[in-house]
Amino acid sequence: MINLEDYWEDETPGPDREPTNELRNEVEETITLMELLKVSELKDICRSVSFPVSGRKAVLQDLIRNFLQNALVVGKSDPYRVQAVKFLIERIRKNEPLPVYKDLWNALRKGTPLSAITVRSMEGPPTVQQQSPSVIRQSPTQRRKTSTTSSTSRAPPPTNPDASSSSSSFAVPTIHFKESPFYKIQRLIPELVMNVEVTGGRGMCSAKFKLSKADYNLLSNPNSKHRLYLFSGMINPLGSRGNEPIQFPFPNELRCNNVQIKDNIRGFKSKPGTAKPADLTPHLKPYTQQNNVELIYAFTTKEYKLFGYIVEMITPEQLLEKVLQHPKIIKQATLLYLKKTLREDEEMGLTTTSTIMSLQCPISYTRMKYPSKSINCKHLQCFDALWFLHSQLQIPTWQCPVCQIDIALENLAISEFVDDILQNCQKNVEQVELTSDGKWTAILEDDDDSDSDSNDGSRSPEKGTSVSDHHCSSSHPSEPIIINLDSDDDEPNGNNPHVTNNHDDSNRHSNDNNNNSIKNNDSHNKNNNNNNNNNNNNNDNNNSIENNDSNSNNKHDHGSRSNTPSHNHTKNLMNDNDDDDDDRLMAEITSNHLKSTNTDILTEKGSSAPSRTLDPKSYNIVASETTTPVTNRVIPEYLGNSSSYIGKQLPNILGKTPLNVTAVDNSSHLISPDVSVSSPTPRNTASNASSSALSTPPLIRMSSLDPRGSTVPDKTIRPPINSNSYTASISDSFVQPQESSVFPPREQNMDMSFPSTVNSRFNDPRLNTTRFPDSTLRGATILSNNGLDQRNNSLPTTEAITRNDVGRQNSTPVLPTLPQNVPIRTNSNKSGLPLINNENSVPNPPNTATIPLQKSRLIVNPFIPRRPYSNVLPQKRQLSNTSSTSPIMGTWKTQDYGKKYNSG
């Protein structure tokens, strides 16, 4: 702290030794004015007061501040000291020479006028008390301005806006705006000057002016670089000190000749100097007319002043040429900074051998062309000089985009090290790795992902085109389009007709969707001995097959001929040229089948065999057609008594395919002809090529296991053929013992039951005496084809089984055949009631004997242990009387038992 008593002793007391409030306020005001002075101006005051001039700005300010505050000391209050310092500050602002402080203080204490003191001090000879001339030494700028000033009168205010007007009072001078490298101020328009006053509401200021002919021609020339700009600055009550930023009152609305100016004249908030002047050039009128400029503002708290100047524009490209002429940042300086940075990392415990530098401009995010930065920047990253200049033309922040320090155009330089890297690396390089010795390595982007994406994109159209071409070549305009979806997994099995496509569930579903329509033109009765082989071969071949009628006349060659479709299928898979011929054959078969569905073929009256027909209403179900209930289906209402049904079953709530059979071959499941079974997936209509249309004998199907725990699996049993009755063979499917499996009895409950109104007759002594000694069938359904044919006329007809149900052959597994020596449990109830109710049945076929059957106890679920009741079901398992849906498809009302067992 500098002791003022060492430099100044005030022994002469003032007129008033007690400080007043006015004196305190005057001291504070003088200190505020002093803090706005520059360092050179502070030194001038220190010279006048005989204070040392060495030190920083803060030291000089503290010295003068303490000198003023000592004037308020009790007993030593000095109002003349404050007036003297204030007079010196006023002389500095007027760029006038300063007198010696002691002379000034004595004149103030004696009451000498200030003008006389100034003249005497400036003209009088040096005195003994003065250690320096009366005119304090000034800076070169002040001496240059002072030399033009008269000693007897003040200089008139210049026309140049850079000059300041001088007066004895605190007059507001003209504003000297901060210079911009993008334009040079040429001339002021005297009439285009407006003042913005402080207002609490809406205010408006306007100016009217005319341009001279020379000025108008200069501004209206399209190739001219001159513009008419409107500047605005805030008035400082302490006076303008130069380099004032451009600031417009906000909010505002600027209009020139009733056209609103939409230039960005606001800039960034809380960042003075980022606003641009308003360009009035495009809206000027000819020199013979008067121009009107209006500024509407509101709620201004400070005064503003607006000036119109004619300026000369400088483009960023012209500034870039100047930057390129500046000295470059040499490579050695960059390498030194790089080594220093890596060394600092090592001192901090970080082992850094290299660093990565981006070659992209942080302003445009494009590859740099003119890598530059300020000479004061302490970083390695550069930016593009041209992009930087264009960005400053829009919003003049003049800050480094990397480190945010202020940048002057004179300090902008090109980096020689980065420019050398840009010249020697490829254009697609965005980053380089730098080492401490200055070596760099280009970092290339990994283009494998983009290449793979482009390759996939190029392959996809080709693949789609090939599929489209194949589709067009294999289709005909007059024939239906059939798409073959056989996968490659079917090819190995196509070579062997005895191997079924039973690999996995996906293959099984694929076979379900690839079944095609089959036209049956032969009789199955004449080829009974070879049914198994024929059916097995037909299952392996999922394409369209047309069996010739000669197949029925040659019993011994039937098996060999049935192998032909399987071999043809193998050839189709191996030879792509045969696909078109097969598709045409399939289309012709389908077309012929559609034409023949509504025609009935009558046989001769003297023939003992029934007539052939392709009418689906005649319910020509062959043994190979299999129906598996998958989901709950909507079926017509059945009016029969539900208590007379055999093999009552729970509904398939989960909608899954039952697992009680295997997909080895085509085991039969008979359903009622009045039930319309819909498949969950679309399938092509088909029928077995080796089975008869109307001569199928009645079938016996074990629908469930014995409730007492018998493990006899469900199997469709066909009695031997008799010439005088309608009989059926044991099974039309070829069963392989190693592929047969016995599933848990839970899934066997998913089989379908059939109405008891269907009348069945048997005339086989082996069936009545040996296989079924007690003439009682537990869980069996006996159907006759004749009865099925007549029921189509008595019940609402819906197609019994769609022809595409043959596609379920591969998805429905088959249990092994029923042993012939297994005894059938008889009903303990000797009421003599038949197993099947025949009250509403159709007339029986002639020459047939009815098997006396007793009414069986109702089987609800084979997994529930037997109850002591015999005729009444538990309430939880009682049938719904209000259900309008037939129980054939398993739509029983289930509660706890159904949920428990079906969930397994």
UniProtKB/Swiss-Prot annotation:
PROSITE patterns to which the protein is assigned, alphabetical: PINIT (PS51466), SAP (PS50800), ZF_SP_RING (PS51044)
Post-translational modification: Phosphorylated in early M-phase. Autosumoylated upon ethanol stress.
GO CC list: cellular bud neck; chromatin; nucleus; septin ring
GO MF: double-stranded DNA binding; SUMO ligase activity; SUMO transferase activity; zinc ion binding
Compositional bias of kind Polar residues: 127-136, 561-574, 596-611, 672-683, 721-733, 877-894
Impact noted for substituting C361S: Reduces E3 activity
Assigned keywords, A-Z: Cytoplasm, Metal-binding, Nucleus, Phosphoprotein, Transferase, Ubl conjugation, Ubl conjugation pathway, Zinc, Zinc-finger
Modified residues (Phosphoserine): S132, S794
Annotated region described as Required for localization at the bud neck, given as residue ranges: 794-904
E.C. code: 2.3.2.-
Protein name per Swiss-Prot or TrEMBL: E3 SUMO-protein ligase SIZ1
Organism: Saccharomyces cerevisiae (strain ATCC 204508 / S288c) (Baker's yeast)
